């Protein structure tokens, strides 16, 4: 792929268009290529925001505005993520769904799955929330009870690992979830945590150890464990075919995931 000399991305939607036109390229490679053009260094998407931050802190752009800007942007992003999280939890707690048979429970990898399209004839709901970890899922698991599902499909752990939580502490919280669902006559179906792509590869040894321990726990508790990694992240890494950003999944990956869990989406 080449980018024309002098081409400037004016907004985030143009970034989306660039990715759509070059769907074999990773997002990171496209951005690296774009910013390798000298003309674009002064025209990055957030440049005007950087100037605003500079003015707020009475700094020149030649000063430490970059650090200040990144700090301010981090606060804004965190606030936005928390706002979305709180709003979604509030909806799950207060906007009641009819009773269902199956619940998909997890973080963004679950949240962004097109489950209704993949299983149009199944009575299921999506209870994934982007950015969540096992602490948040423990807090949220109670809002699944009113749905009276037969089974809950769980994927969790990658955000905990990336946030530095120990495998032991994550598994302890995971076990609390499993015990909670079993005590309430809901069958938990555990899905392996997926490996990540090359840019996040430092997490993969932890994912491997985590999954091995999780599988042992499921065996002891007589809980179904579905190893998604065999198909979705073989060779202990998430291939570019299955992810554009080394973490979240492509449509083809969700289709493969759906086929792997289809045998469990039935009434026993």
Feature names for model-found ranges:
Residues 64-172, 199-202:
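Conserved SGNH/GDSL esterase-like catalytic core that processes O-acyl groups on lipids
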Residues 1-101, 237:
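N-terminal secretory targeting modules
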Residues 2-7, 12-18, 45, 67-70, ...:
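Catalytic His-Asp segment of secreted/periplasmic serine-dependent ester chemistry enzymes
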Residues 155, 159, 177-208, 232-235:
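Active-site segments of SGNH/GDSL-like serine hydrolases
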Residues 124, 188, 223:
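Hydrophobic anchor at the start of a short beta-strand
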Residues 167-176, 206-211:
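Charged helix-capping and loop-helix junction motifs
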Residues 105-107, 191, 226:
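Active-site flanking residues adjacent to catalytic metal/cofactor-binding acidic residues
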């Amino acid at each position: 792929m080449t980018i024309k000399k002098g081409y400037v991305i004016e907004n985030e939607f143009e970034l989306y268009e660039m990715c759509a036109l070059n769907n074999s390229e990773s997002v990171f490679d496209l951005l690296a290529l774009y910013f390798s053009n000298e003309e674009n260094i002064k025209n990055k998407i957030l440049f005007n925001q950087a100037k605003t931050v500079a003015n707020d802190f009475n700094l020149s752009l030649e000063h430490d505005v970059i650090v200040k800007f990144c700090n301010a942007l981090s606060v804004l992003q965190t606030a936005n993520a928390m706002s979305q999280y709180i709003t979604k939890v509030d909806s799950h707690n207060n906007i009641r769904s009819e009773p269902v048979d199956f619940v998909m429970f997890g973080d963004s990898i679950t949240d962004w799955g097109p489950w209704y399209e993949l299983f149009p004839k199944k009575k299921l709901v999506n209870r994934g929330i982007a950015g969540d970890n096992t602490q948040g899922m423990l807090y949220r698991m109670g809002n699944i009870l009113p749905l009276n599902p037969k089974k809950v499909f769980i994927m969790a752990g990658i955000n905990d690992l990336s946030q530095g939580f120990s495998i032991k502490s994550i598994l302890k919280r995971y076990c609390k979830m499993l015990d909670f669902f079993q005590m309430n006559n809901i069958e938990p179906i555990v899905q392996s945590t997926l490996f990540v792509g090359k840019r996040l590869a430092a997490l993969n040894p932890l994912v491997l150890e985590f999954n091995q321990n999780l599988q042992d726990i499921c065996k002891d508790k007589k809980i179904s464990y579905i190893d998604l990694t065999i198909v979705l992240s073989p060779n202990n890494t998430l291939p570019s075919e299955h992810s554009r950003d080394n973490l979240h999944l492509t449509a083809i990956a969700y289709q493969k995931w759906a086929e792997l869990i289809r045998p469990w989406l039935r009434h026993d």
